[in-house]
């Protein structure tokens, strides 16, 4: 198995993989345009020349990033592909000296084995204000928030909503 940075040529396969699980409501959908726009966020797993998994590490602030769009081809499951992808995300986050990474997930046992811990959604204000405000599940989110502290004893920078340009917030200021 090879874990490598995604290229633009991988976008359609990444989209198909994510859509497979999104159609079953096991993860949020990602428009193809979003995948192209964020292709540098993605790592892919390849076995015998076939893309069998993907995971994105999306930077959400100077000290945090989200593991998102983790998907493994069901035919290639149970081979450690998801683990290898998230470990690549963790390594990249450490290279960038991030304090914390997080995921919103349905597979808490998987992330717990990698050292993530469950936290309240309310403890993730950047995620809520930057992404969740645009999600159809905003008021009924059933995903579990989990974090992995990368630097022991160091907390992420406190959140100040005035630093984020969110249409609803900006309209309230008028």
Q: Regions from the language model: what does each represent?
A:
Residues 16-29:
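Helix-loop element at the rim of GNAT/NAT acetyltransferase active sites that forms part
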Residues 99, 105-131:
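Conserved active-site alpha-helix within GNAT-family acetyltransferase domains
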Residues 29-42, 46-47, 53-70:
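A conserved beta-strand-loop-helix scaffold within acyl/acetyltransferase catalytic domains
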Residues 1-2, 95-101:
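Short active-site oxyanion
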Residues 78-93, 103:
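Conserved acetyl-CoA-binding loop-helix of GNAT-fold acetyltransferases
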Residues 124-174:
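C-terminal "cap" of GNAT-fold acetyltransferases
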Residues 70-77, 106-107:
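A short, internal acetyl-CoA/4′-phosphopantetheine-binding micro-motif in the GNAT/acyltransferase core
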Residues 2-14:
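A short beta-loop-alpha structural element at the N-terminal edge
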